Design a protein with these regions (language model features):
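HIT superfamily nucleotide-processing domains
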Residues: 1-369
């Protein structure tokens, strides 16, 4: 893998990743030496503290202006074919591209608003980095339609971005995710994901860290390794098993077709995965995406997130890297909505058993690649 870093006319950086025939791209300086700069003219987002829930939220009003469901010929993530109508990606072709989001929730190169001293209503600059990762120049592709090698290349890019963004002194957590389908709020259909380099550890991950730490202190074991051992022994909730990777519908699933994907070996982050583990993970992600699409015979919407250890310098050896998929469909023509009990009480209601949904996914093709 090689990288070529360029700067867009508005000041945002863009990184081309080359593999195979394009692997002759020149190497570039890591982001730790060249901190990313946000685009000029972008209003500075602000972090605001919720004293009731004791967690941060972000106010980024300029995101109201982001692109909303453009026609395919106006897609900003397709390669530039006509110099008179440039897209976000100037090159006419590419493998994978990562660049600063035009409408970021966190930024790193602006004059930030002053931090408030109000004990109740705390606020401070939303300092961080928001990137877009475009998986392929093919507007109609998906993780399921990409080759295993292409997904493997994507895993490599995720690991690289995790390492470089995590090395920035103001970043405490590198959060990788993909939103797929209008049912989960997608406004651009070109296959892509995003990365948020947070200045704090997000609440969902904080809770997982606390549980994993407590379990290790109590039992001497990794909580997630313990869960995987039980799932393999039982088998009813497994969706697929690879040499180095497992996928399951959790016993504690909140979404009907929720799937968690784990490396079998205890690793805490993407950069720690071996070459064989990265390839096996790519196979698992491609197979799972194919199962989702074949389940009801249409492109299956989902939210995919990567949970890995923080980059805050603390010892998080008790944690376990994994992917989580949250599809909103509960049947072919019905969606699960978050309503009163989920939003107001924080308790998820599941209209099906995880065992039943795992069986449906096991039986859906493909079974291997």
């Amino acid at each position: 893998m090689r990288k070529l870093r360029t700067v867009k006319p508005d000041g945002r950086y863009l990184i081309y990743y080359g593999f195979g025939e394009r692997a002759d791209l020149p190497a570039i300086s890591p982001l730790g030496e060249t901190p990313p700069q946000a685009a000029e003219g972008v209003p500075a987002p602000q972090m605001r503290w919720n004293p009731v829930l004791r967690q941060w939220g972000v106010v980024a009003s300029h995101r109201q202006e982001r692109t909303f469901l453009p026609a395919e010929e106006r897609c900003p993530f397709c390669p530039t074919r006509d110099p008179q109508r440039p897209t976000e990606i100037p090159a006419p072709d590419f493998d994978i591209v990562a660049f600063e989001n035009r409408f970021p929730s966190f930024v790193s190169g602006l004059s930030f608003p002053a931090e408030t001293e109000d004990e109740l209503y705390r606020a401070q600059p939303a300092r961080g980095v928001c990137e877009v990762v475009v998986y392929t120049p093919d507007h109609h592709a998906s993780v399921a339609s990409l080759s295993v090698q292409q997904v493997r290349n994507l895993v490599e890019v995720w690991a690289d971005r995790s390492q470089e963004l995590g090395a920035l002194e103001f970043v405490r957590y590198v959060f990788i995710f993909e939103n797929r389908g209008e049912a989960v709020g997608v406004t651009l259909h070109h296959p892509h994901g995003q990365i948020y380099a947070f200045p704090y550890v997000p609440p969902a991950v904080e809770r997982e860290l606390a549980s994993a730490r407590a379990h290790e202190e109590r039992t001497g074991r990794c909580l997630f390794c313990h869960i995987l051992e039980r799932e393999v022994a039982g088998g009813a909730r497994l969706v697929l098993e690879g040499r180095h990777t497992l996928a399951m519908v959790p016993f504690y699933a909140r979404w009907p077709y929720e799937v968690h994907v784990f490396p079998r070996r205890h690793v805490t982050s993407l950069p720690e995965l071996s070459e064989e583990e990265r390839m096996d993970l790519a196979r698992a992600l491609k197979v799972l995406a194919g199962k989702y699409d074949n389940l009801f015979g249409f492109p299956f919407p989902y939210v995919m997130v990567v949970h890995q250890r923080p980059t805050d310098g603390a010892d998080h050896g008790y944690y376990h890297l994994h992917f989580e998929f949250y599809p909103p469909h509960r049947t072919a023509d019905r969606l699960k909505y978050l309503a009163g009990v989920e939003l107001g009480a924080g308790t998820f209601l599941l209209d099906a058993t995880p065992e039943e949904k795992a069986r449906e996914l096991r039986e859906a093709p493909p079974h291997s690649v």
